[in-house]
Amino acid sequence: MNKRVIVYVLGAVLLIEAALMLLPLLVAVIYRERTGWYFLWVLLGAAALGALALGLGGRKRSAMYAKEGLIAVALSWIVLSLVGALPFTLSGQIPFYLDAVFEMISGFTTTGSSILPAVESLDRCMLFWRSLSHWIGGMGILVFMLAIVRMDGGQAIHLLRAESPGPTVSKMVPRMVDSSKILYGIYFGLTVVQIILYLAGGDPLFDSLCNAFGTAGTGGFAIRNDSFASYSAYTQTVTTVFMALFGVNFSIYFFLLRRKFDLAWKNTELRWYVSIIVISTLLITFNIKSLYHGDFGYSLHHAAFTVSSVITTTGYGTENFDLWPEFSRVILVLLMIVGASAGSTGGGLKVSRVVILMRAAKAELRKILHPHTVKVITVDGKPVSGETVRAVSTYFILYVLIAAASVLLVSLDGYDGSTTLTAVLATFNNIGPGLGLCGPAGNFAFFSPLAKVVLCIDMLLGRLELYPMLVLLMPSTWRKK
């Protein structure tokens, strides 16, 4: 294993994180918050370590292969979170380091699960850093690195494949580095449009920035204790629309920019994604209408916001959906599992995987009924290879096994089944709130240290699509041959 190239990547990540910490430091200066100085000390330390790692890793640095790419990605996200948590603990805003690490892993993985009972108790620089972590993690820190750091295309593809969500990673243009620049260009552009719309609705600049960062990364860290409940209907509607937009595969936007409208519209995953949102919203609207005195418009507004928030794994809330009827709650749990589109900033199993699994199951049933019939599985009018179907099936099996093991470990805390199960689903699928004690009106502070560590690992597993973390944790990875 080429450890030098891994050290080099970690060094670059530390330097980028140090540079990004200048932003919350600026916020602290503007609002005259003393806690902001802790960002200065941490960024100086991170910059020094990053420069050292870059120097050590840059000497005689050889090629990066798939194994190194997976390990570099997993370690980068862990280091990013461990360093990002330091300002919270050093300043005393989150006294226990494990809680601060939980908060930052939740931030960078765009989960949005929080250990804070009252977020408004944090200084603005800390709130800004929490929200910014969503924006950084949404598209991926290493995608950002590839957009600004020169790296060989062969090495870049291993990093991008290890970090990007979805069954496959395709090049939008011949050079991988150019693809990462296009991705971040689209990401940045959509974020700016959302900020402008917030400002046009009268929201303060600070709120507009933080809420746009959380929406873009489909993260869900709110800066108000009631999440989005106290914002205007206009702001809630803008958020509903943009949560859904950031849950779309970003290659769709690339097609639209290239005026390839037919490719965008014929995309199977996009059609399923839109259909799931529309059908789920209508079902929940009619189910909760009686709770809101038969007001269809009001029910539709909150159902649309919640469905968009849950399927994209954002986690913002306007209502405590844990109080909704069982039918609506079951739909939301299913949406937690399905998740957003591959190639988006959302989490979950991904719509594309669900489509392939369902079509593979349908083909298998037809084969049982008609053994001599050859049924080819297609997506977007193209045949899906047997290798892709096997890869998706393997991923699903691992997904179920890890979720089951996590539920078993978290259940040692002795909380009710709804709380335990949805805490795992909420973190593993990078959603944020679950049901029960960790629902929209609750938090994750009450869990034991062991449960918090398990949930932290689940957040990383979910965001990195299992394999980077599994390779990192496998003993055989570190054995000398």
Predicted regions located by residue number:
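Membrane-proximal intracellular helices of multi-pass ion channels
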Residues: 1-481
